[in-house]
From Swiss-Prot:
GO MF, one annotated term: protein-macromolecule adaptor activity
HAMAP family registered for this protein in UniProt: MecA
NCBIfam families membership: PRK02315.1-4 (NF002643)
Stretches that traverse the bilayer: none
Gene (UniProt): mecA
Domain notes: The N-terminal domain probably binds unfolded/aggregated proteins; the C-terminal domain interacts with ClpC.
Protein name: Adapter protein MecA
Length: 250
């Protein structure tokens, strides 16, 4: 189990599925509030070294966020006692003033006083909701980063350099493998082909083999696609190799 303090009023406890099983708990136990669940919460609180400001707090509220391999438990402290009495409502008007209030006015005054007493609880709940939202955003960003990394590994860009358009057209005639995207640029009196290949499903050494095959008829270049896009002149878009294959080499 891991514990992380998110704010003065909220901590997050991460419990792995193995820890749940050791304690005789299942995911389904958290779907419906029950005495077994509450006992489990307070048991893990006893096991963990709680922050000092949580030890003497009043009520504790728990919110569970199930994950595929773990459970996140958000614990929010409250300073509002379970049994709110009129002695706690010291800011209520005196009895003489209360006697002149209509029932509606009295209820509004009582509601206002209770709201003031429970304001910290409301702020704690808002803090908890903010923490959950930030965690969801972080997880979403991590998933996006992972997807981006996977895409980067799946696709490979090759940049090839040719002295003239005739050499580029001659190279295009040799292409007998699948290309997902290709562009032809002119930059500094030379011609450049950018070739995007999807290598998913191919052997690990396929990208190196493909580069060696390309270098039989072209020179690979250190110039990046970004440089070509910014400083080069785009001649053929998207399917440049196919376009060059239609050029008759004299």
């Amino acid at each position: 189990m891991e514990m992380k303090q998110i704010s003065d009023s909220t901590i997050k406890i991460t419990i792995q599925l193995e820890d749940l099983e050791k304690r005789g708990m299942e995911m389904a136990d958290f779907l419906v509030p029950q005495e077994k669940t509450e006992e489990f919460f307070y048991t893990i609180l006893d096991e963990l070294e709680m922050p000092d400001n949580f030890l003497d707090s009043g009520m504790l509220s728990f919110r569970v966020t199930p994950k595929p391999d773990k459970v996140d438990v958000f614990v929010t402290k409250s300073k509002l006692d379970k049994n709110l009495s009129f002695e706690d409502l010291a800011d209520l008007p005196d009895m003489d003033e209360l006697s002149h209030m209509s029932p509606d006015e009295f209820l509004k005054t009582l509601e206002k006083s209770i709201f003031e007493k429970s304001k910290e609880d409301i702020e704690a709940v808002k803090s908890l909701e903010t923490a959950e939202a930030e965690e969801r955003e972080q997880l979403s960003q991590e998933a996006a980063d992972e997807q981006s990394a996977e895409n980067a590994e799946r696709y490979i860009y090759y940049i090839l350099r040719f002295e003239d358009i005739k050499a580029a057209a001659a190279f295009a005639q040799t292409v007998d493998y699948k290309i997902d995207l290709s562009e032809l640029y002119k930059y500094d009196s030379a011609y450049y082909l950018t070739i995007l290949v999807d290598v998913e499903g191919f052997p690990e050494r396929y990208p190196a083999w493909l580069l060696a095959k390309m270098r039989e008829f072209a020179d690979d270049s250190d110039i990046t696609r970004a440089v070509l896009q910014e400083h080069g002149h785009l001649l053929l878009v998207t399917d440049a190799v196919s376009g060059l294959q239609k050029v008759e080499c004299l």
